């Protein structure tokens, strides 16, 4: 019988991992800042993609200064991640592609974000106008090339809540009751032909315009 004895020394470094958000931070999230709703056809592959993408961003937390990437949040847009083939817009035409419907979620979130007074850091419109949001208020995704992003510019954490059921998609942004500083934000698109110029306006409690920003110019085919 042979007995082998070894003295094994393991150099371990203790790392104190702090949670991303504290209970005090959570207590600051006490108010629905904005909401937006679109409708979709349920019971088919596209509707399933809408619901899948919406579920992936439900309860998503952004700390102050943190940037949201739609592609990182819902991707990869592949079959093994729950997505199916459905109509997508490619070069101004409807074709069958994986993940058709995910852009309805990004576009619904885009409107929710603008209603919350938050500007995009990256956003592109579809090559062809869509029917679920006005022109100039859509946000497309092309995996690996086009993303949709925004940064939490509040002094408080924010949470994205989604609900997609029976053909109705609603997205809410929650944060602190003082996040908007008393300003009511409204995006408006001015459409001329195939071009839409989108502005974000802010109004105080008396209805006076206190903020105006040209966001983007969207050109459609």
Indicate where each model-derived feature is located.
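Well-ordered beta-sheet/strand-loop patches within structured domains
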Residues: 1-221
């Amino acid at each position: 019988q042979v007995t082998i004895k070894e003295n094994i020394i393991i150099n371990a470094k203790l790392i104190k991992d702090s949670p991303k958000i504290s209970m005090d931070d959570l207590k600051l999230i006490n108010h629905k800042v904005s909401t937006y709703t679109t409708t979709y056809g349920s019971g088919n592959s596209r509707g399933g993609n809408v619901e899948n993408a919406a579920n992936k961003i439900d309860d998503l937390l952004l700390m102050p200064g943190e940037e949201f990437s739609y592609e990182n949040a819902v991707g990869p847009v592949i079959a093994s991640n729950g997505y199916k083939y459905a109509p997508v817009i490619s070069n101004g035409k409807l074709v069958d592609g994986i993940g058709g419907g995910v852009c309805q979620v990004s576009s619904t979130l885009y409107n929710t974000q603008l209603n919350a007074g938050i500007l995009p850091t990256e956003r592109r419109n579809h090559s062809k106008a869509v029917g679920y949001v006005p022109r100039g208020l859509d946000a497309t995704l092309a995996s690996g090339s086009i993303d949709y992003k925004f940064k939490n510019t509040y002094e408080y954490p924010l949470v994205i809540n989604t609900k997609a059921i029976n053909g109705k998609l609603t997205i809410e942004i929650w944060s602190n009751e003082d996040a908007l500083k008393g300003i009511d934000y409204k995006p408006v698109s001015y459409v001329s032909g195939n071009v839409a110029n989108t502005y974000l306006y802010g109004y105080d409690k008396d209805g006076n315009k206190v903020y105006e920003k040209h966001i983007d110019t969207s050109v459609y085919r």
